[in-house]
Amino acid sequence: MDEQEPAPKRGRRFKEQTPVQRALGLLVRREHSRKELNRKLLARGIEPDAAQAAVDRLTDEGWQDDTRFAAAVVRNRAGSGYGPLHIRAELGTHGLDSEAISAALAAFEGDWTENARDLIRRRFGEQGPTDLPQRRKAADLLARRGFEGNSIRAATRFDLED
């Protein structure tokens, strides 16, 4: 019998993606800040000038928007039980300036004190913290989660008639 050479593979040949296509691929999964998107493109081997040009183009075309990104992070983290101090710090790590962060937090339509109370209800039950050690634990939890002092005091007081 003859030994046959294997037939050449007829798989698809993928073109190398452009920097804009790679950035758009990241943005369709979730929102990214300009700094974060640029960093991820650089990590994928895109040249710095090409990465910056791709981010600029997607920003100009409305695919990337730091304001929209900040609002999404605020909504998501507030819904997960985090307070404004934690969210402000996280947005800072994403490279947003303080004005954009303040605007996103100001645009949040929820009530931070009510969010703190909801978190306490989930952790301590509907009656809330009943004695001083539980109130301290609740206050510590809220402080770790980034709530401000006024919200912590109001939430750990836990008078449902407030």
UniProtKB/Swiss-Prot annotation:
Compartment annotation: Cytoplasm
Domain of life, per lineage: Bacteria
GO cellular component, one term: cytoplasm
Any one Gene Ontology BP term: regulation of DNA repair
Chief place of localization: cytoplasm
Coiled coil: none
Keywords: Cytoplasm
InterPro entries for this protein: RecX_HTH_1st, RecX_HTH_2nd, RecX_HTH_3rd, Regulatory_RecX, WH-like_DNA-bd_sf
Family, per entry: Belongs to the RecX family.
Task performed by this protein: Modulates RecA activity.
Name of this chain's protein: Regulatory protein RecX
Organism, scientific name: Xanthomonas axonopodis pv. citri (strain 306)
Lineage, opening ranks: Bacteria, Pseudomonadati, Pseudomonadota, Gammaproteobacteria, Lysobacterales
